[in-house]
Design a protein with these regions (language model features):
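Sec-dependent N-terminal signal peptides
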Residues: 4-13
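N-terminal signal peptide c-region/cleavage motif recognized by signal peptidases
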Residues: 15-17
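Structured catalytic-domain cores with a bias toward divalent-metal coordination
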Residues: 20-153
Length: 153
């Protein structure tokens, strides 16, 4: 377990580009992702909403965000790109429990299952609604299919 933590500490030095941003405030640095705002030293566990397609198909992305007490880089860890990849999903759930945001420099975004439609349908590579592979859909489209919208977030 210590080797895993050491690897993640080294990885944490790499800043990953996301649609999340740090909001500068006079008293502290807030972290915003989707419609969620997190204060320094806090953890958010919940879902990011994926906008509906044609008022019918909707989804969400379960995440954990540890926003460190001190400024630093942002690291995104993403599991569940394909609907049948269970090991990374379990690994992210366990890893999320190990982080103490009060001791953290920067922010860790953990996406537990990126592709809920494929996970729910147990499809290997493609989403059941639009037959697109999330891994091939990045950077995504704000007004695209459900898979493209997930990739955009």
């Amino acid at each position: 377990m210590k080797k895993v933590l050491i690897i993640f500490i080294y990885l944490f030095l790499i800043s990953v580009n996301t649609h999340a941003e740090e909001k500068q405030s006079s008293s502290n640095n807030l972290f915003e992702i989707g419609d969620v705002i997190i204060s320094p030293g806090e953890t958010y566990r919940g879902n990011l909403k994926v906008s509906k397609v044609n008022d019918a198909i909707e989804s969400f992305i379960p995440i954990t965000v540890h926003h460190g007490a001190n400024p630093g880089p942002v690291l995104s860890l993403i599991a569940g790109i394909h609907g049948s990849e269970y090991s990374p999903i379990l690994a992210m759930q366990e890893f999320a429990k190990l982080i103490d945001p009060s001791q953290l420099n920067g922010t860790v975004i953990i996406v537990h299952i990126a592709n809920i439609p494929a996970f729910a349908a147990r499809t290997i590579y493609i989403g059941p609604n639009d037959l697109k592979n999330l891994n091939r859909s990045f950077p995504g489209k704000v007004n695209g299919t459900i898979t493209e919208r997930i990739a955009y977030i």
